Amino acid sequence: INIGSKLMLSSIASMLIMGTIRFFVQQQWSIQTFGKLSFTLSISNMFLTFINAVGIVMFPLLRRTNRDRLSSLFQTLRGVFVPLTYAILIFYIPAKIVLGMWLPEYEVSLRFMGILFPIVIYEGRMSLLINTYLKTLRKEKTILMVNVLTLTLSLLLSLFVIFIIGNLNLTVGLILASLAFRCNLAEFFLCRDM
């Protein structure tokens, strides 16, 4: 129960990182603006669903791996995964062209996509590599701490950026910055513990 509750709270905090920003955008700007941002996030989530499915398969494999080999295996997987996810960004331009012709009224969404598409890199690395490894090493408390810290930081910064500065592009950039911070912080703790 102790491990499960930490993972559940961690998962809720992780969802709220983007969820609170989406909520504040909905409160501050029009429903059309919110819809365009949500469209972009939905496309990013489509890629993340595939990556999460691979992460679910990896966990049992890592649990059976000798603990002494986990560090070298992490370096190998990271060496494959990071360039692969950066390569996915190449598809941004063709996707923008095709979607621009198909949905011309969503031009703003396509601009957001350029900022938010890198979410796939950070969220993918987080769910496929870092969280899977932290769970394998029984570091659920670290996952929870990183997600709660990122949620707190994201919440405070989003209140400032959305309601005081009032800049939508900065708000969209804040989503990416929050997820990049979470990924890098979790990876720091993972590398320190391995």
Identify the residue ranges that each predicted region occupies:
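Interhelical loop/hinge segments that connect adjacent transmembrane helices in multipass membrane
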Residues: 1-18, 57, 61-71, 190-194
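Membrane-water interface at loop-to-transmembrane-helix junctions
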Residues: 1-10, 68-85, 108-114, 136-144
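Residue-level recognition of pore/gate-forming positions within transmembrane alpha-helices
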Residues: 15, 42-45, 120, 150-152, ...
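Helix-loop junctions and terminal segments of transmembrane helices
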Residues: 44-68, 130-136
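Alpha-helical transmembrane segments of multi-pass membrane transport and lipid-handling proteins
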Residues: 51, 74-124, 152-164
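Membrane-interface junctions at transmembrane-helix termini in multi-pass inner-membrane proteins
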Residues: 120-148, 188-194
